[in-house]
Amino acid sequence: MTNIRKTHPLIKIINHSFIDLPAPSNISAWWNFGSLLGICLIIQILTGLFLAMHYTSDTMTAFSSVTHICRDVNYGWLIRYMHANGASMFFICLFLHVGRGLYYGSYTYFETWNIGVILLFAVMATAFMGYVLPWGQMSFWGATVITNLLSAIPYIGTTLVEWIWGGFSVDKATLTRFFAFHFILPFIITALVMVHLLFLHETGSNNPSGLISDSDKIPFHPYYTIKDILGILLLILALMTLVLFSPDLLGDPDNYTPANPLNTPPHIKPEWYFLFAYAILRSIPNKLGGVLALALSILILMLFPILHMSKQRSMMFRPLSQCMFWILVADLFTLTWIGGQPVEYPFIIIGQLASILYFMIILLILPVISLFENKLLKW
C-alpha cells in the first residue's frame, strides 16, 4: 500500500510543501522568519477573531468596548495585548525577513519577491486600519492625517478622501468600514502567502552563499521542522514577555484618551513600525512630493531585481556591499528615531539627510559598488 502522505490529493500538497520539500543544507537562522511570519499571522487571526466577538465598530461605543474587553471578558486583556504586541512582532519579523532577502539576493526570484512586497503593503494597510479601531486620540488623528494625504492626488484627491471617509470627516462611517477591511484583509493576506509559497517552491529556497544548491538538498522534515519549532518557541517567549511585563511599551499613551475631534494631540505619530516611512513623508515640504516619497520608500523594493549589478547573488563575499547594507540599516534606524521626534531643528535636517541617503544607497551607491566589485573579481 502506498503512503497516504504521498497519494491523498490534499495531504500530498502539504507533504510537498512542509515534509518532503528539498531544502538547501546550509540555510541559517535568517531563513526562520518565513515560518515565524506564518505563526504571527495565525496568532493575529485567532486573537483578532476573539476580539471581534466583543468589539463594536461604533464611534459612541468603540472605546468603551475595548475597555470592556480588558476589564470584563475572561482573559480579554491577554487577547487584546497579544493582538497589539503581536503586530509589533509581525513587523519585526517582516523587516528581518526583507533584510535577509536584500542581503542574500533572494530578490532574484522576482515573482516571489514582488508578491512579498505586495504582502508588505497589505500588512501595513491592515495594521494602519487596526490602529484606528480602539478610537483613542491617536487612532482618530492618525486616521485623519494619513487618509488626508490622498487629497494631494491632483484633481480627484478631495473627492477620493471624502469617499474613503464616507462623509466630510473621519466619523462613524469611516470606523465601520475600517473594521470591515481590517477583518477581511488578513484572509486576503493568507491567500497571498499561499501564492508567495507557490512561487518559492517553483524555484526552491536560496541559501547564504547564493550558489545553486541542487546537488546538496535535504528533506525539510525533520531538519527544518525542528529548527522552525525552536524559532517559534523563541518568538512566543519574546511576545509573552512583552505582553505580560510591559504591554504598553510600544503603544502611545494618547490612545488611552477617547477620540476628540476638537482637541489635537501635540505630536501626531503612527506606531513605531511606520515611523521610518513617516519620517520620509515629513522630510519633503511639498504635500504631493511627500506622499510620492512615502509610496516609493516601499515600492523601491520592487526595483532591487533590476538594480542588481553584481555577478554574485549574495553579499556573503562582497565586503563593500555588506558595509553599504549595514549603513542602510543604520539609516533606517535613524529615520525611525526621527519619525518619533517633533518637527523642529535639528530633527528636520537630520530627517532630510537620512531620507536622501536612503534613496541614494538603493538607487545609486549599491549598484555602483556592485560594478566596482565585479572589476575586483578580475584582479
Curated annotation (Swiss-Prot):
Superkingdom as given in the UniProt entry: Eukaryota
Transmembrane segments: 33-53, 77-98, 113-133, 178-198, 226-246, 288-308, 320-340, 347-367
Gene Ontology BP annotations: mitochondrial electron transport, ubiquinol to cytochrome c
Binding site for heme b b562: 83, 182
Alphabetized InterPro entries for the sequence: Cyt_b/b6_C, Cyt_b/b6_C_sf, Cyt_b/b6_N, Cytb/b6-like_sf, Cytochrome_b, Cytochrome_b_C_euk/bac, Cytochrome_b_N_euk/bac, Di-haem_cyt_TM
Cystine pairings recorded for this chain: none
Cofactor note: Binds 2 heme b groups non-covalently.
Keyword check for Mitochondrion: yes
Localization of this protein: Mitochondrion inner membrane
Membrane topology: Multi-pass membrane protein
Binding site for heme b b566: 97, 196
GO molecular function, one term: metal ion binding
Transmembrane helix listed as a keyword: yes
Primary subcellular site in the record, as a coarse category: mitochondrion
Cofactor requirements of the protein: heme b
GO CC term, one of those recorded: respiratory chain complex III
Description of how the protein assembles with itself and partners: The cytochrome bc1 complex contains 11 subunits: 3 respiratory subunits (MT-CYB, CYC1 and UQCRFS1), 2 core proteins (UQCRC1 and UQCRC2) and 6 low-molecular weight proteins (UQCRH/QCR6, UQCRB/QCR7, UQCRQ/QCR8, UQCR10/QCR9, UQCR11/QCR10 and a cleavage product of UQCRFS1). This cytochrome bc1 complex then forms a dimer.
PANTHER family: CYTOCHROME B (PTHR19271:SF16)
Family membership: Belongs to the cytochrome b family.
Miscellaneous comment as given in the Swiss-Prot or TrEMBL entry: Heme 1 (or BL or b562) is low-potential and absorbs at about 562 nm, and heme 2 (or BH or b566) is high-potential and absorbs at about 566 nm.
Role according to the record: Component of the ubiquinol-cytochrome c reductase complex (complex III or cytochrome b-c1 complex) that is part of the mitochondrial respiratory chain. The b-c1 complex mediates electron transfer from ubiquinol to cytochrome c. Contributes to the generation of a proton gradient across the mitochondrial membrane that is then used for ATP synthesis.
Descriptive protein name: Cytochrome b
